A protein has these predicted regions:
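Cap/insert and terminal regions of metallo-dependent hydrolase folds
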Residues: 155-234
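Bacterial N-terminal signal peptides
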Residues: 8-20
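P-loop/Walker A phosphate-binding loop and immediately adjacent motor/lid segment at beta-alpha junctions
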Residues: 84-108, 193-203, 222-223
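Hydrophobic/aromatic beta-strand patches that form the interior of the parallel beta-sheet core
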Residues: 71-73, 97, 119, 171, ...
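Core dinuclear metal-dependent hydrolase active-site scaffold
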Residues: 26-67, 71, 101-165, 180, ...
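Positively charged n-region of N-terminal signal peptides that target proteins for export
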Residues: 1-5
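Di-metal (Zn2+ and/or Mg2+/Mn2+) metal-binding site signature of metallo-dependent hydrolases
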Residues: 61-101
């Protein structure tokens, strides 16, 4: 009986070791959760990283603000992009980066937060948006996934340089009222050369948070249309 008990204990120990090894292997193989993006409408984006960090960009439209933020990014000071008060900030600390900090001293800044690196890039360049008061952002997550958000803009001199980053996704405003329209945005997508090009900010804020008609006018190669309220997994293409 004692011998059988010892054999049973040894069998259980071996099973536990195999289980632990399997879990360790899964983690080593990339057990981290996928990065998820929620398009809230207009230019508002929520991203939950593989580490569980929550990033909001240009809070204003839609729903989905219940998750406490670790990072809030604002591209410029217009009221349809900077409703930071909509977002509950994480009690342990939340970083808020606005265009003012990202363009301090007239230089586009970069910020390394560990789970994501943020690079401010040129935006504006039209009568409604001064390049000295607007930025776009390139976000690169810890798994290598990279995403460009144009902010409110027309074509900028820096856009061709972004092609060298081999971006996974690029979001282009295309309302055609206060910024470039779908045709110009399509031309910008050809300059940036992201693997997936996404139309957003498809209408003036007084009209609607999302226009499928305008989104479909965006004719970029590898176009990806994300509707308001739609969530997707961000994937890094090597």
């Amino acid at each position: 009986m004692i011998r059988n008990l010892i054999l049973t204990i040894l069998t259980l120990c071996a099973a536990m070791c195999l289980c632990a090894a399997g879990l360790a292997a899964a983690e080593a193989a990339g057990g981290q959760s996928a990065t998820r993006l929620l398009y809230q409408g207009h230019a508002s984006i929520r991203i939950v990283t593989g580490e569980g960090k929550v990033v909001y960009i240009d809070p204003y439209a839609g729903e989905g603000y219940e998750l406490p933020a670790d990072l809030i990014l604002v591209t410029h000071g217009h009221s349809d992009h900077n409703k930071v008060g909509l977002v509950k900030q994480r009690a342990g600390g939340c970083r808020v980066i606005t265009h003012a900090e990202a363009l301090a001293g007239g230089e586009h800044k970069s910020f390394d937060l560990g789970y994501v690196s943020v690079r401010a890039v040129e935006a504006g360049n039209n009568p409604n948006h001064d390049v000295s008061k607007c930025v776009g952002y390139v976000l690169t997550f810890s798994d290598g996934t990279s995403v460009y958000f144009s902010g409110d803009t027309s074509t900028t001199k820096q856009m061709p340089e972004l092609a060298a980053l081999k971006l996974d996704y690029a979001f282009f405003c295309c309302d055609g009222v206060f910024n470039m329209g779908a045709e110009e945005a399509s031309q910008c997508a050809a300059l940036v050369k992201a693997k997936q090009s996404v139309p957003y900010h498809t209408a003036a804020p007084r009209d609607t948070d999302f226009s499928m008609e305008r989104a479909e006018e965006f004719k970029a190669d590898n176009r990806l249309i994300i509707e308001k309220g739609q969530e997707m997994t961000l994937k890094h293409s090597r």
